[in-house]
From Swiss-Prot:
Domain annotation BRCT: ranges: 597-673
Similarity field: Belongs to the NAD-dependent DNA ligase family. LigA subfamily.
A biological process from GO: DNA repair
This protein's name: DNA ligase
Gene3D superfamilies the record matches: 5' to 3' exonuclease, C-terminal subdomain, 6.20.10.30, BRCT domain, DNA ligase/mRNA capping enzyme, Helix hairpin bin, Nucleic acid-binding proteins
HAMAP family: DNA_ligase_A
Obligatory cofactor(s): Mg(2+); Mn(2+)
């Protein structure tokens, strides 16, 4: 095929692929299978590899990802991206409606309509299109400036790389540069798929956290694999300044954007109340998370006249649905065994509908929590779900009073290996001491070792680990590196191809960094931050292994408790046997070349995060501090340089204020990056 023919075929494939993207992500009416779509994309990628000069910025092949981004530069928004005022009260919604009408009447303007839209629980972004082509995508940041994440946003199939030609031609000549604002979110099914197979401690709490963390990943190929969606909720920069907001939403749909479709023009207050009431239940049937309703004045040309406070506009408000609760019966309690031997009680509930799904289980955390709640088997309990995947029991129902309720008894023996349980002094949890032989602990250690933040062996999921442990093929992570195809192929859902993929993934884990190996070992109290401190203080594994307790305790962020835990870990014969296997397998036993530093904005500073961050996943924010020369610590002292306080910050914030340690919010933290 000559160049001219290739150019024609590339153009045809691009048009066809984008048409199917639109039908799938915007219209929700696919006409071909995923396999057929993948074949079209493969054909395009193959042709572009043969003719790299024909690759353009709007090619659908860019959605596959693969680019590694060292950092995300800051960009200033054309106009501030203000957050909306929130309310959980219908009375405050009515007050907002009347206040806007009164302000307009004072200006001599008659009654105006409102637009009600579903509030998507995601991450706000801004997209800039120049001459119909996507040129920039940025996070909201502090509202004034955000991070340029264009390379990651290009992987989202519901974001047009080029605006739909037929609709874009209706824009005037002055519309050469427009801005589209909206929300990136992760559909429920894709979120469940992302969490599936991850160990408990490595799972995302909710789709919003997963989205925020994914958008800041440096590997765009991984971003593409996680399948997020974009919903557009405002169009700025068009020539017709008097185009109502409702009409702008319609135009966004014609330009190729998903707009959610569930929005309504509301002339009167009762129309708003009806919309909110309708969607309080209907929202659970949607394939994505919505947590409220946004109300905006339809007359966009009046927004500037109404103005804004320092934080939010006066022409819009967000009504948020309250946390969902249900009352059901506690049927029983099962006891799970974690990788460190911790016994966790889990409530088995009479199935009840809650937040759009059937709930039959809830964590009880520990036995002190059971005592605090005063809960017994066969009690009627109040279960709440608010943004998290796992619901929680918040209290015993007032009308419980069952004559048949019985106390929850602490088990005497491990439910996995039947070893007598122990409870260390000053701890709330019970433990199984059979570390080497308990199947549940072995399973947990294997999953932790293979998890994303450890050795990242993606082919090693829960079902496969259960088979490997159950058949005695592995007793610790060191056994992974001696697995052979004949051992793997007979396993359920494996076969030759899957077995080869697993062996390849295990081989690739040998190249992971020394600090990740230290974290993957699963030493009690040694998280990712502590593993990095240890790797920095002891760049050779042999020196760490030989270090004394007092010496370890003097390492920053270690202290006597962690030091004792490290010494105890290395003193166990089964641990030594595992380490010998890992060393023989060629795992990194010393630190490699240090990661390149982005800048020195946190040079020499010890930083701690407390509370929930709105725009970052905690581990991603901590990594940003390290990339800029800072050090993450786990407790507040007079030596702490900076405390970044998010929502519902607790005792660490109080201690910082008492000690006079500098405290900043998420906005100021982003500005420091």
């Amino acid at each position: 095929m000559d160049r001219a023919m290739a150019a024609d075929e590339i153009a045809r494939l691009r048009k066809e692929i984008e048409r199917h993207n639109y039908l799938y992500y915007v219209e929700a009416e696919p006409v071909i299978s995923d396999y057929e779509f993948d074949r079209l994309l493969e054909q395009l990628i193959a042709l572009e590899r043969l003719h790299p000069d024909l690759v353009t910025p709007d090619s659908p092949s860019l959605r596959v990802g693969g680019q590694i981004t060292r950092s995300f530069p800051s960009v200033r928004h054309r106009e501030p991206m203000l957050s909306l005022s929130n309310t959980y009260s219908m009375e405050e919604v009515a007050d907002f409606y009347r206040r806007v009408r009164r302000l307009l009447l004072d200006e001599g303007i008659g009654e105006q309509e409102m637009v009600a839209e579903l509030k998507f629980d995601g991450v706000a972004v801004s997209l800039i299109y120049r001459n119909g082509l996507l040129v920039q995508g940025a996070t909201r940041g502090d509202g004034v400036q955000g991070d340029d994440i264009t390379v990651n946003l290009r992987t989202i199939s519901s974001i047009p790389l080029r605006l739909e030609t037929s609709a874009s031609e209706t824009l005037s000549g002055s519309d050469r540069e427009i801005e589209v604002r909206g929300e990136v979110f992760m559909p429920k099914e894709d979120f469940d798929r992302l969490n599936e197979g991850r160990p408990e401690e490595d799972r995302f709490a909710n789709p919003r956290n997963a989205t925020a963390g994914t958008l800041k990943l440096q590997d765009s190929a991984e971003v593409a694999r996680r399948r997020m969606t974009f919903v557009a909720y405002f169009l700025k920069g068009i020539g017709d300044q008097h185009m109502p907001h409702f009409d702008r939403l319609k135009l966004l749909g014609k330009l190729g954007f998903f707009t959610g479709d569930h929005y309504r023009l509301c002339p009167e207050l009762h129309d708003i109340e009806r919309f909110i009431g309708e969607w309080s239940e209907k929202r659970w049937k949607l394939p994505y998370e919505t947590d409220g309703v946004v109300l905006k004045l339809n007359a966009v040309w009046l927004w500037e006249r109404l103005g804004a406070t320092s934080k939010s506009p006066r022409w819009a408000i967000a009504y948020k649905y309250p946390a969902q609760q249900a009352i059901t019966e506690l049927l029983g309690v099962v006891f799970q065994v974690g990788r460190l031997g911790t016994i966790t009680p889990v409530a088995e509930l009479r199935p009840v509908k809650l937040a759009g799904s059937t709930v039959s289980r809830s964590t009880l955390h520990n036995f002190d929590e059971i005592e605090r709640l005063g809960v017994r088997v066969h009690d009627r309990v109040v279960v709440e779900k608010s943004g998290e995947v796992i619901p929680k029991i918040i209290r015993v129902a007032e009308d419980s009073g069952s004559l048949f309720s019985v106390p929850i008894v602490v088990p005497e023996r491990c439910p996995s290996c039947d070893t007598p349980l122990t409870r260390p002094e000053n701890e709330v949890s019970w433990y199984c001491p059979n570390e080497e032989g308990c199947p549940a602990q072995i399973r947990g250690r294997m999953l932790h070792y293979a998890s994303r933040n450890a050795m990242d062996i993606q082919s090693l999921g829960i079902a496969l680990v259960d088979q490997l442990v159950g058949r005695g093929l592995v007793k610790d992570p060191g056994d992974l590196y001696s697995l052979q195809l004949p051992q793997l192929e007979p396993l359920e859902r494996m076969g030759t191809k899957s077995s080869i993929n697993l062996v390849r993934a295990i081989e690739e884990s040998r190249t992971k960094s020394y600090d990740r190996l230290l974290y993957a070992l699963g030493i009690r109290h040694v998280g990712q931050a502590t593993a990095r401190e240890l790797a920095g203080a002891y760049p050779y594994f042999a020196s760490l292994h030989e270090a004394g307790e007092q010496e370890l305790a003097e390492v920053p962020d270690i202290g006597p408790v962690v030091a004792r835990s490290i010494i105890d870990f290395f003193s166990k014969p089964w641990v030594q046997a595992m380490l010998d296997k890992l060393e023989q397998a060629g795992l990194p036993m010393r630190a490699g070349k240090e990661k390149e530093q982005v800048n020195n904005n946190f040079e020499g500073q010890s930083v701690i995060f407390t509370g929930g961050l709105e725009r970052h996943v905690r581990q991603e924010a901590e990594e940003m501090v390290r990339e800029r020369g800072g050090r993450i610590v786990s407790s507040v002292s007079k030596k702490t340089s900076l405390v970044v306080a998010g929502k519902e910050a607790g005792s660490k914030l109080e201690r910082a204020l008492k000690l006079g340690v500098r405290v900043i919010g998420e906005d100021e933290f982003e500005a420091m990056l």
